[in-house]
């Protein structure tokens, strides 16, 4: 097979030589094949720019070059210079000037790498001027001219040694175009682009007149040594300079960015440390098992020691001792608080209407502040701290470069359309996906054109607003037309023209003729997006109608590698200018986006059978968050109603059917709910007076949260009032006061703990969470105060109504005389007393409970180490939001991450040579310059999260100044003398270059830098000068009035970022890179010590918090434990043991909650942190009541006191705490907002369930083992109270006994009168009480 191929090649070469014999009869050293110019190629009608003249056929000896001709040859083709007297060439002065002009376009791209530029020039100098031209050139086609004139050469063959050509190609293969963040060979290799380019394809493109730049056809033959050749042909094998070697004393080697061989050895970043293992077990799991085992063993030892101690104590029990001093101190807080609240409750109950009026006035006065409320809906203002580093960086960026443009984006995939094969004449057989079908493209073109021509009426502007009024127009920002607007899509490869999309043509390539159409042009443009004229017979441009390239990763998605034809999705992106919030153009942009969304919704509905469409506007996220907030308000209203109904029903004591209307508590329940709402409104109004902005999240969640807490207190208070019988001769007001003195310390303990936890939660810098925490903390305090005033007054009035046997709600009507309540024990109390408490505290069950809970604690310690940190933005959306599909498509199909800008602040001298060398990446720049470090980082995208190296205005500015390009020129005469002459001006008046020619890298002086930089930033790029900076850098450099660079930015791209963890790590990695760059640039002479480089990505403001949320959360939660313990310790009577057990239970609830968060898919972030802070406060509700009940019990043994607390306070906690939380929480599960569902429904459900389990299961068992000893002072006081109770009481006619002393006794729950210290403890029943 190989022999046959070589034979065919030899035959082809011989045939070619035979055909060309007429034009190149001699192949000898020192003989030319053509010489002098013969005008334009008559076979070409025109090109992208003015084409060079072709040469005349001339089989003559090479000419001796002297004088100006020699100087010109030495300057343009230095490798052909052999000295002043021995230099021969085959080109005239005109040919040299034409050669220089024709190479200027390509040299502008390659000049940043001197070796590449020189090698490229050398190739064409040899072709045109080599004195041995006939040895490797064979003319194959000429065009006859007039009589007596030599023919014009329009095609020839060039024979090169393959190694020679490949070395030349290798020297240029890595040269970059900074503005496009791509390789220069990508625009010099035709349909193959940079990915498929090689030496043969690179040379073929240069010799193809179809590219619009070549004046004649050149066929390049790359031959191996020893390969058969036509007679006389000797393949060119000239000098090729490696890119990592200097070309002279003053020239610099190519930089690492343009030449891999110049790169220093960059050690790869350290691999991620493997997980810590102990044997085959993960280290965390092993350590937690060891810790849990030690904890269980320690607990078992403590329990055993306590049991032995109790036995010894029982054996040695003698006469009862007098209370010790510590016990008296423990009693003191009980007594003080109990007496205070008893007196307070009695006074409030005595003046109910006055207290209600004063409470109403205070609430109204505070709530009036809501007239000044500022509702924040901007996601940036809600979820990013105003003083955070990311916000400061955003402010700096927006101030100096303007806000990041507004993105309106569409993803489209095909339904039920299978892929197909296409035999491309250019690239062979290719797979095309279903979405890449002509009928689909035509339909999407219609959609795109409808969107481009959208107009919407603006009341403020009193005219129609169109896209051109607000669009981002990089090449014409000042006088924008519709075709100047930046719209990126595959359709831009056809300039949004239906005729061009449907164009077809016949083309012959390598002897094969085939029809070429849009698919061939698409393949060409996807591989070479910088092409101005493709190599097909269609001869279409790949540039968008607004003048910039469309890179395939921005136009299609869902492909592998560079197989763009297999893309599953098409992407259309409309980029709009962004404006400050108070700019009237911002409202215009939002109006256009509103019309854009309506058009897309209509298109999605009408084409649902063909397309799957996902879309988003810049305003979409804010709109959807606001929409779901409004939609979910009824859910919260239903939650309120259910809690209200439960309270109203549960607070009643229904002893007889005939007394239901009287014993109902609907009015009291409604009053309790109104008290909670009043507290919330007052808290929000107070902060509105202070100018603290609020949010819709606060309006939704805070009332629900405070209702859950407030309902607990209401239930416990009323239930205690019903259970605590009125003493003989005791007035209603005194009865209420005594009840309040009994339960208010527990209510104070819980409310104070929760409020402190919320205020500590306000330490988080996230505005929405901080405001939520502040409002919740104040609302809980106000709720407690209103419960101590307004609700006590309501209870007094309700008790008066009930004693008068008036029906609830319709209290103005009196009823007939009703029978007294029937004595009956409630089902809940009976269940706890007869079944639950005996089972839980059985001697075999208690160790099992301890073991299970400690095992659960250990398992959740491990699970909490695996919780995800972050908050994906789609979770802030409702479940039915169209943005859910958009974010799904964005993560699935977009093949590049967001742009990241490395921003430089003021204080760095870019105009100095040292400053330029420290930031650029071309020849002469430092190996560890700013842009070079970003390049190194992009080689390790998995660690640096940078995938595409940065564009560099410094590099392109230097290239723009290079004399060999046609970019920076000056008028030499006329009124604009010495002013900038644009590259589009081809007159002889623009022959003066801005910079003089030098052997080394071009570096302007400070004066030249400040003069030429504004010209560069306003020069539009074009085919003659692709380095113009208007499109890429107009907004990237901020200049002061005297021309100093006060801020600039270098744009790179992240790799695709799929979730919040990726965004967080990308921010962390880019900051580390920027800090490293900053440290080096501060060493440049003249740099301000405060100079800084920082990374800016539009999403940084949202993900900044996740860099520190973990340590901040640990600190905040640990800080919450301190006041919780202190408050419990103080209000439990300076009882250290009770305080520690209380704290232990709360810590276990918290750890179990976090561990189960990982199981249920709840990530850790500022929203869940504030809920965990809430968990600490709510845990107090579940454990503190029972702990306090145990601490004040006078039963002789811990087991009896644990049973006592479980039966009476445990049942109250279940009915009053858990059952008031569950209805409201379960309703949250119906909310549309995923944020509410996940972080409020799921998390609060976990908190409530775990709090209930630890409070009613674990805590009684722990107290039965490790609880504090009985308080002897309390026992003594109870004994004295009992003795006083049996003594005869003096008559007091001023306060006669009520007629119906038991009218307000709830016999469904209440025991007989409990003997105990007045207002020092709850009415906990004795063992001999009757029910």
UniProtKB/Swiss-Prot annotation:
Q: What quaternary arrangement does the UniProt entry report?
A: Interacts with RAB11A, MYO5B and RAB11FIP2. Interaction with RAB11A, MYO5B and RAB11FIP2 is required for proper transport to the plasma membrane upon cholesterol depletion. Interacts with NPC2. Interacts with LIMA1.
Tell me where on the tree of life, at the top rank, the source sits. Answer: Eukaryota
Lineage of source species? Eukaryota, Metazoa, Chordata, Craniata, Vertebrata
Predominant location: membrane
What is the membrane topology here? Multi-pass membrane protein
Q: Which residues form the signal peptide?
A: 1-20
Q: Gene name?
A: Npc1l1
Disulfide bonding pattern of the chain = 32-90, 38-56, 77-125, 91-129, 113-254, 116-172, 189-197, 243-259, 256-263, 471-485, 525-542, 920-925, 967-1025, 981-990
Task: Give the record's keywords alphabetically.
Answer: Cell membrane, Cholesterol metabolism, Disulfide bond, Glycoprotein, Lipid metabolism, Membrane, Signal, Steroid metabolism, Sterol metabolism, Transmembrane, Transmembrane helix, Transport
What is the designated name of this protein? NPC1-like intracellular cholesterol transporter 1
């Amino acid at each position: 097979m190989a022999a046959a191929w070589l034979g065919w090649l030899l035959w082809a070469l011989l045939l070619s030589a035979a055909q060309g014999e007429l034009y190149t009869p001699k192949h000898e050293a020192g003989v030319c094949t053509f010489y002098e110019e013969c005008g334009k190629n008559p076979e070409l009608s025109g090109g992208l720019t003015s084409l060079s003249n072709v040469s005349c056929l001339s089989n003559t000896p090479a000419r001796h070059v002297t004088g100006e001709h020699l100087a010109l040859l030495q300057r343009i083709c230095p490798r052909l210079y052999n000295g002043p007297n021995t230099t021969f060439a085959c080109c005239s002065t005109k040919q040299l000037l034409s050669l220089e002009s024709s190479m200027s376009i390509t040299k502008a791209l390659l000049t940043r790498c001197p070796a590449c530029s020189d090698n490229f020039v050398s190739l064409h100098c040899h072709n045109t001027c080599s004195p041995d031209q006939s040895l490797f050139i064979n003319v194959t086609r000429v065009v006859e001219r007039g009589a007596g004139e030599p023919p014009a050469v329009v095609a020839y063959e060039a024979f090169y040694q393959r190694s020679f050509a490949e070395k030349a190609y290798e020297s240029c293969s890595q040269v970059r175009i900074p503005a496009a963040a791509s390789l220069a060979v990508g625009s010099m290799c035709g349909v193959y682009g940079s990915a498929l380019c090689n030496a043969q394809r690179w040379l073929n493109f240069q010799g193809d007149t179809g590219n619009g730049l070549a004046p004649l056809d050149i066929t390049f033959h790359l031959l191996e040594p020893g390969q058969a050749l036509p007679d006389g042909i000797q393949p060119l094998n000239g000098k090729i300079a490696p890119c990592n070697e200097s070309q002279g004393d003053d020239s610099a080697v190519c930089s690492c960015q343009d030449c891999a061989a110049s790169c220093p050895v960059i050690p790869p970043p350290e691999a991620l440390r493997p997980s810590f293992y102990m044997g085959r077990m993960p280290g965390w799991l092993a350590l937690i098992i060891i810790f849990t085992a030690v904890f269980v063993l320690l607990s078992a030892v403590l329990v055993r020691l306590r049991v032995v101690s109790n036995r010894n104590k029982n054996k040695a029990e003698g006469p009862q001792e007098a209370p010790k001093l510590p016990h008296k101190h423990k009693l003191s807080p009980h007594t003080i608080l109990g007496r205070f609240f008893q007196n307070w409750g009695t006074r409030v109950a005595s003046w109910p209407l006055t207290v209600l009026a004063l409470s109403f006035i205070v609430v109204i006065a505070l709530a009036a502040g809501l007239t000044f409320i500022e509702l924040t809906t901007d996601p940036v203002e809600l979820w990013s701290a105003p003083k955070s580093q990311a916000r400061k960086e955003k402010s700096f960026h927006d101030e100096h470069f303007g806000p990041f443009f507004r993105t309106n984006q569409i993803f489209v995939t095909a339904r039920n359309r299978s892929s197909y094969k296409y035999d491309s004449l250019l690239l062979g057989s290719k797979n095309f996906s279903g979405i890449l079908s002509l009928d689909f493209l035509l339909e999407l073109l219609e959609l795109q054109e409808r969107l481009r021509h959208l107009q919407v009426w603006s009341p403020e502007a009193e005219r129609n607003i169109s896209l051109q009024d607000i669009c981002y127009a990089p090449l014409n920002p000042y006088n924008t037309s519709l075709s100047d607007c930046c719209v990126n899509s595959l359709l831009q490869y056809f300039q949004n023209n239906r005729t061009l999309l449907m164009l077809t043509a016949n083309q012959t390539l390598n002897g094969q003729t085939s029809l070429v159409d849009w698919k061939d042009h698409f393949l060409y443009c996807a591989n070479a997006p910088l092409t101005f004229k493709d190599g097909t017979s269609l001869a279409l441009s790949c540039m968008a109608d607004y003048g910039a390239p469309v890179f395939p990763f921005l136009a299609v998605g869902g492909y592998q590698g560079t197989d763009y034809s297999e893309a599953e999705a098409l992407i259309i992106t409309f980029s709009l200018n962004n404006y400050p919030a108070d700019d009237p153009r911002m409202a215009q942009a939002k109006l256009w986006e509103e019309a854009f969304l309506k058009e897309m919704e209509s298109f999605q509905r009408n084409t649902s059978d063909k397309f799957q469409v996902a879309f988003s506007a810049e305003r979409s996220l804010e709109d959807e968050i606001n929409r779901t907030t409004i939609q979910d308000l009824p859910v919260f209203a239903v939650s309120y109603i259910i809690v209200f109904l439960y309270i109203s029903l549960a607070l009643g004591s229904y002893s007889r059917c005939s007394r239901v209307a009287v014993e109902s508590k609907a009015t009291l329940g409604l009053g309790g709910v109104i008290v909670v709402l009043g507290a919330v409104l007052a808290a929000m109004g107070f902060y509105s007076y202070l100018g603290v902005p609020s949010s819709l999240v606060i309006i939704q969640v805070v009332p629900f949260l405070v209702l859950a807490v407030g309902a607990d207190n209401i239930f416990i208070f009323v239930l205690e009032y019903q259970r605590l019988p009125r003493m003989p001769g005791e007035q209603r007001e005194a009865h209420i006061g005594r009840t309040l003195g009994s339960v208010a310390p527990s209510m104070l303990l819980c409310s104070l703990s929760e409020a402190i936890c919320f205020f500590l939660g306000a330490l988080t810098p996230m505005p929405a969470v901080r405001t939520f925490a502040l409002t919740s903390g104040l609302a809980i305090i106000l709720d407690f105060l209103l419960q101590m005033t307004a609700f006590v007054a309501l209870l007094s009035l309700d008790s008066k109504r009930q004693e008068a046997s008036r029906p609830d709600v319709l209290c103005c009507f009196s009823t007939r005389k009703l029978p007294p309540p029937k004595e009956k024990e409630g089902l809940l109390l009976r269940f706890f007393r007869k079944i639950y408490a005996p089972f839980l505290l059985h001697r075999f069950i208690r160790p099992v409970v301890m073991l299970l809970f400690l095992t659960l604690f250990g398992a959740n310690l491990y699970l909490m180490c695996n919780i995800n940190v972050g908050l994906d933005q789609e979770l802030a959306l409702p479940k039915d939001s169209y943005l859910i599909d958009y974010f799904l498509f964005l993560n699935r199909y977009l093949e590049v991450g967001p742009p990241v800008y490395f921003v430089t602040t003021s204080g760095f001298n870019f105009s100095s040579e040292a400053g330029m060398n420290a930031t650029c990446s071309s020849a002469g720049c430092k190996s560890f310059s700013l842009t070079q470090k970003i390049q190194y980082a992009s080689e390790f995208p998995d660690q640096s999260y940078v995938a595409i190296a940065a564009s560099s205005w410094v590099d392109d500015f230097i290239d723009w100044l290079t004399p060999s390009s046609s970019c920076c020129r000056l008028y030499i005469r006329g009124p604009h003398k010495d002013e900038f002459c644009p590259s589009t001006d081809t007159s002889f008046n623009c022959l003066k270059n801005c910079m003089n020619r030098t052997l080394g890298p071009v570096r302007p002086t400070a004066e030249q830098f400040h003069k030429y930089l504004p010209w560069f930033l306003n020069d539009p790029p074009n085919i003659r000068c692709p380095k113009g900076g208007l499109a890429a850098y107009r907004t990237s450099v901020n200049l002061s009035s005297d021309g100093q660079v006060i801020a600039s930015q270098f744009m790179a791209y992240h790799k695709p970022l799929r979730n919040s963890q990726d965004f967080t790590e990308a921010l962390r990695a880019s900051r580390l890179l920027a800090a490293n760059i900053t440290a080096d640039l501060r060493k440049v002479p003249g740099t301000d010590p405060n100079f800084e480089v920082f990374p800016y990505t539009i999403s940084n403001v949202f993900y900044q918090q996740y860099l520190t949320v973990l340590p901040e959360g640990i600190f905040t939660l640990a800080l919450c434990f301190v006041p919780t313990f202190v408050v419990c310790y103080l209000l439990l009577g300076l009882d250290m043991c009770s305080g520690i057990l209380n704290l232990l239970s709360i810590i276990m609830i918290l750890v179990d909650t976090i561990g189960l968060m990982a199981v249920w898919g709840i990530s850790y972030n500022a929203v869940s942190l504030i809920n965990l802070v809430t968990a600490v406060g709510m845990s107090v509700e579940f454990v503190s009541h029972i702990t306090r009940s145990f601490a004040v019990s006078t039963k002789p043994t811990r087991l009896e006191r644990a049973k006592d607390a479980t039966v009476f306070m445990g049942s109250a906690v279940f009915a009053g705490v858990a059952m008031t939380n569950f209805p409201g929480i379960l309703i949250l599960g119906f909310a549309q907002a995923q944020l509410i569902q996940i972080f409020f429904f799921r998390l609060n459900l976990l908190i409530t369930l775990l709090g209930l389990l630890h409070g009613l299961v674990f805590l009684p068992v722990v107290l039965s083992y490790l609880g504090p000893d009985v308080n002897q002072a309390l026992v003594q006081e109870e004994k004295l109270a009992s003795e006083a109770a049996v003594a005869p009481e003096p008559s007091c006619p001023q306060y006669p006994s009520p007629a119906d002393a038991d009218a307000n006794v709830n016999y469904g729950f209440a025991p007989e009168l409990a003997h105990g210290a007045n207002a020092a403890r709850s009415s906990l029943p004795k063992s001999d009480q009757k029910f």
